[in-house]
């Protein structure tokens, strides 16, 4: 006989009379006693992660939202009086704060912010919200960090109310008054609204619809808490970077609840992984059949919209206008998530068989052990305020870079870690704020090739051009906002990242290397033949000037740390405010990784052997020929940029190593930094280094910035480069992989 079950705050579960979802349930089985015990164990496992808020804190949130709601009502009455509405209308004019997102779903964590929507009647304008209501908030003692973002895609007021972060959207309905029992799911409310109000309403409408489409809200909430924690721990929780955001995870869990309406959380977590590890993407996930609504708004429909047919992992919002919440998902991010679903299924299989504990599901795999090759992106700005804006823009475009990388014929997977990290300062004496992202790469196996040359120049350059162009067009760009990119091997990451994120890594021979502050003299990226690419600011490089093709920065020629062999030189990513023509090649280890597994691999900790290391000094080019301006700058013939070269042995490769030597040195040998004068130098010409010094280059850059700081804010959003172009620098990140 099935055991009745009561979960936290829920009533006894009975077989549902109502049909949920677009298909019949897979199973109507009621929970067993073992399921109840596993669910209780799941709750106990979740508690230390802070996914449950204390009752006292929850009451505090309710109190704050009550104060905010009263402020809205008071403000709307004042607006109504100022617009001479009849007293009878003013007394019942209403106005209300609605919540959405994780708080409305009931799955918010400790310290999480609140997403809120201010709903006002038709006589209250958006301009009133961003003026008089903003001023009213400013007068409140509890309100701190008040800021308005009126020009955003979804305009918002952000604030901290008595220690709780709140984002408030605004929607004006075509109603004379706002009743207390207003149901925002009513499609007729969307009539005669402007698009910004429709967007603002969408969050509440979707959240409310989800809660009405699950059989048991308490079981849904506990399952969603577990899945969200799992996704965050496994670094696949980020809509902006091409993974899934909170609403998408909620819809996947809701669909699981529909398919197993009587199951409780322990079963639902397992069924979640079962369903979506076997889901035949790109078949869409739908919580209900889309309903026709004659409001002429664009909806997700691949039968009508050709672009919708290219969505890889569609999860469709249940409220009109239906949208795909996962349009950012790429081939790589879907591959990573599906692999994580499969691993989640394997672990929950073990848990249900009492072969593992729930804690195993929430163990964080070490991203920095999964791959042999990484691209590190660095964004820097001179002030903290500028850094926040710059980092936001760069992060929003990283998925474009991932999409470009995965189209490279030699790349199987480009996996960006959603976590960003503070980057070590380039110059400890200079005020600079730097943020770093890491992208793991898996290269395809190729047969009949000892060495594979992979050129990532075009992919990186297209990305940086896009970011700079948007920054200038949106009038956000400031001098000294920079992006740098470099290729790094797994064993070098300890020189860039905090030690706590690399704790699963074997100890390196790094005596004498200090992680913080980390300047160029303590960062040696050459021991594994890595290449770097540095992209200058778009306001620089307006005139012909000496080039520093090595891309090095102050401190480059200072003594290397103890970890490096004496014969190995530094090659690293820096931001150089001058146009460059830089092509680099390197030989690395084999790259036959499969899709990342949860299990970590031991890091290679052997220092490079000087006997097998071959050093070719970087060449700096003095007095280059003048570069054409305008669009011509982007059309300079360059045999490297954009060419997807086939694999071919390098003619001057060092003798083939034995298997033992290969294991120890394949990631350590042959440092090449090729730079060119019209790309015509031979290898023999590269064995010299000119006398141009970095200090001279920096002085030249400084003088150029001072004299060439011209307004770029009138750029139109067109593909062609403006007259004073964002420099399309033919820098190069090229890898030569030993087979």
From Swiss-Prot:
Residues annotated as binding ATP: 100-102, 109, 113-115, 167, 228, 237, 246-247
One GO cellular component term noted in the UniProt record for this chain: nucleus
Chain intervals with Polar residues compositional bias: 535-557, 595-604
Protein residues bound to Mg(2+) 2: 113, 115, 167
Catalytic reactions on record: RNA(n) + ATP = RNA(n)-3'-adenine ribonucleotide + diphosphate
Residue numbers of Phosphoserine PTMs: 10, 24, 537, 558, 732
Cofactor(s) this protein requires: Mg(2+); Mn(2+)
Effect of residue 635 to Q: Weak binding to KPBN1. Cytoplasmic location
Effect noted on mutating residue 644 to Q: Weak binding to KPBN1. Cytoplasmic location
Gene3D superfamilies assigned: 1.10.1410.10, Beta Polymerase, domain 2, Poly(A) polymerase predicted RNA binding domain
Record note on what altering residue 113 to H does: Abolishes most of the specific and non-specific polyadenylation activity
Main location: nucleus
One GO term (biological process): co-transcriptional mRNA 3'-end processing, cleavage and polyadenylation pathway
Documented EC number(s): 2.7.7.19
Annotated residues for binding of Mg(2+) 1: 113, 115
Placement of sequence motif Nuclear localization signal 1: 490-507
Effect after changing residue 292 to A: No change in non-specific polyadenylation activity
Basic and acidic residues bias spans: 649-660, 676-686
Residue(s) carrying N6-acetyllysine: 635, 644, 730, 734
CDD domains tied to this protein: NT_PAP_TUTase
Protein name, as recorded: Poly(A) polymerase alpha
Source organism of the structure: Bos taurus (Bovine)
Lineage: Eukaryota, Metazoa, Chordata, Craniata, Vertebrata
């Amino acid at each position: 006989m099935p055991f009745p079950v009561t979960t936290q705050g829920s009533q006894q579960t009975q077989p549902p009379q109502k049909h949920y979802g677009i298909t019949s349930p897979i199973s109507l089985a009621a929970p067993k006693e073992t399921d109840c015990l596993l669910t209780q164990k799941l709750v106990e496992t979740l508690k230390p992660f802070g996914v449950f808020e204390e009752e006292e804190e929850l009451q505090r949130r309710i109190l704050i939202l009550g104060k905010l709601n009263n402020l809205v009502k008071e403000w709307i009455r004042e607006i109504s009086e100022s617009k001479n509405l009849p007293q009878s209308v003013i007394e019942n004019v209403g106005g209300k704060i609605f919540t959405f997102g994780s708080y409305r779903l009931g799955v918010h964590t400790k310290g999480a912010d609140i997403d809120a929507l201010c709903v006002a009647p038709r006589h209250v304008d958006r301009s009133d919200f961003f003026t008089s209501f903003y001023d009213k908030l400013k007068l409140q003692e509890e309100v701190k960090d008040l800021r308005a973002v009126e020009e955003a895609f979804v305009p918002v007021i952000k604030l901290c109310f008595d220690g709780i972060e709140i984002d408030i959207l605004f929607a004006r309905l075509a109603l004379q008054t706002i009743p207390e029992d207003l149901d925002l799911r009513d499609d007729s409310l969307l009539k005669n609204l402007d698009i910004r109000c429709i967007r603002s309403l969408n969050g509440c409408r979707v959240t409310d619809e989800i809660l009405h489409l699950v059989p048991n809200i308490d079981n849904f909430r506990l399952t969603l808490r577990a899945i969200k924690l799992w996704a965050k721990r496994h670094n696949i929780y980020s809509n902006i970077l091409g993974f899934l955001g909170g609403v998408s995870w909620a819809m996947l869990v809701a669909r699981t609840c529909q398919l197993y309406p009587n199951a409780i959380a322990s079963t639902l977590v397992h069924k979640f992984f079962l369903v979506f590890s076997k889901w035949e993407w790109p078949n869409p996930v739908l919580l209900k059949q889309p309903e026709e609504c004659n409001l002429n708004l664009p909806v997700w429909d691949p039968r009508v919209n050709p672009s919708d047919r290219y969505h890889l992992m569609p999860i469709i919002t249940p409220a009109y206008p239906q949208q795909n919440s996962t349009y950012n998902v790429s081939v790589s991010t879907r591959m990573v998530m599906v692999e994580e679903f499969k691993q989640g299924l394997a672990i929950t299989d073990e848990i249900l068989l009492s072969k593992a504990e729930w804690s195993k599901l929430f163990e964080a795999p070490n991203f920095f052990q999964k791959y042999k090759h990484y691209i590190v992106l660095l964004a820097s700005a001179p002030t903290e305020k500028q850094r926040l804006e710059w980092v936001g823009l760069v992060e929003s475009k990283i998925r474009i870079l991932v999409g470009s990388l995965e189209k490279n014929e030699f790349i199987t997977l480009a996996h960006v870690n959603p976590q960003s990290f503070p980057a070590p300062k380039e110059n400890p004496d200079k005020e600079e704020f730097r943020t770093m992202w890491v992208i793991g790469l898996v290269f395809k196996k190729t047969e009949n090739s000892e060495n594979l040359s992979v050129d990532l120049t075009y992919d990186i350059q297209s990305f940086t051009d896009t970011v700079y162009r948007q920054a200038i067009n949106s009038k956000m760009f400031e001098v000294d906002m920079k992006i740098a990119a470099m290729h790094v091997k797994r064993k070098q990451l300890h020189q860039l990242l905090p030690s706590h994120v690399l704790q699963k890594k074997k100890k390196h021979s790094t005596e004498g290397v200090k992680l913080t502050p980390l300047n160029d003299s303590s960062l040696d990226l050459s021991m594994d033949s890595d290449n770097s690419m540095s992209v200058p600011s778009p306001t620089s490089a307006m005139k012909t000037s000496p080039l520093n093709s090595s891309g090095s920065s102050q401190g480059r020629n200072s003594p290397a740390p103890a970890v490096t062999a004496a014969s190995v030189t530094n090659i690293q990513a820096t931001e150089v405010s001058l146009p460059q023509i830089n092509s680099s090649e390197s030989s690395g280890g084999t790259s036959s990784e499969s899709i990342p597994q949860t299990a970590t691999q031991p890091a290679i900790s052997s220092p490079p052997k000087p006997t097998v290391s071959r050093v070719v000094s970087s060449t700096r080019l003095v007095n280059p020929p003048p570069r054409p301006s305008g669009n011509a700058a982007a059309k300079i013939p360059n045999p490297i940029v954009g060419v997807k070269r086939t694999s071919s042995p390098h003619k001057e490769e060092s003798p083939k190593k034995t298997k033992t030597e290969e294991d120890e040195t394949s990631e350590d040998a042959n440092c090449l930094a090729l730079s060119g004068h019209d790309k015509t130098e031979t290898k023999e010409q590269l064995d010299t280094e000119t006398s141009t010094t970095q200090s001279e280059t920096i002085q030249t850059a400084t003088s150029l910035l001072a004299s060439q700081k011209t307004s770029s804010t009138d750029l139109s959003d067109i593909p062609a480069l403006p007259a004073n172009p964002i420099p399309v620098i033919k820098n190069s990140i090229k890898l030569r992989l030993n087979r």
